[in-house]
Amino acid sequence: MGQIDSRAQQTAHAIWSAWTGGYRLTRLPKEIRPTNAADGWAAQLALAELAGPSYGYKFAATSKAGQAHIGVTRPLPGMLFADFRRDPGAVLPSAGLHMRVVEAEFAFLMGRDVPSGATAAEVVDAVDTLHLAIEVPDSRFEHFERAGEPALLADAACAGWFVLGPEVSDWRGLDLGAAETELWINGARAATGRGANVLGDPRAALASMADQLARFGTTLRADQVITTGTTTVPPPIAPSDHVQAKFGPLGSVSVSFAS
């Protein structure tokens, strides 16, 4: 391994140790701290070797609220790891959560590979199905809002738990930007938003994801799930909470948290 590969592996080991050990990093040691996006992505690839199979990507900070939440100025791609995927209605662990927020998102299941250099229309055309989703992001950094883009890329863009909900039928003719979203916690409405909050439209976020991955020499693949970011300001959650993400006439998806 070259020096950069070795440093990326050390970064990944530090992050994975915090992830599995249930503690937070104040800051990475200077000698293994990523200083640019390429370093951060290399560390995320090394993290994937520790975290196990991935099945797609999340797109963090596609809304102004999301960017403010984690202290960045542009969206960041992060791998979704299979060990942290759950079905609708699941009870997620509360212990060890640091961010303690929940997000209502639109997610796409890709039907075929997307070649490098594809247009936005070609990226959307490669989609198989659209789904409603809930993400419970998390970070291994104590002060994630000050960690910076390279470190957050290494941290899989604050990947955490993910729930892929029901398929939306006949979605291609819908104005997803106008689609209203709500998060209800224990029967009370906690947040509202709309699809336009993710780069104007979830389709635009998907196309932007393809462009972001291209920066790192990666493309979208068939059967990958791509979730496009929070449509609302993420509300806080607590142990024993029941969360329902409502997408108007498109449907809903729910999840609960252990006491």
Where are these regions (language model features)?
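Short, well-ordered amphipathic alpha-helical segments that serve as non-catalytic structural scaffolds
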Residues: A205-Q212
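DNA replication sliding-clamp ring fold and its partner-interaction surfaces
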Residues: Q212, F216-T219
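Structured functional modules or segments
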Residues: T218, I226-D241
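Catalytic-core "active-site belt" of small-molecule-metabolizing enzymes
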Residues: G2-D201, R215, A238, H242, ...
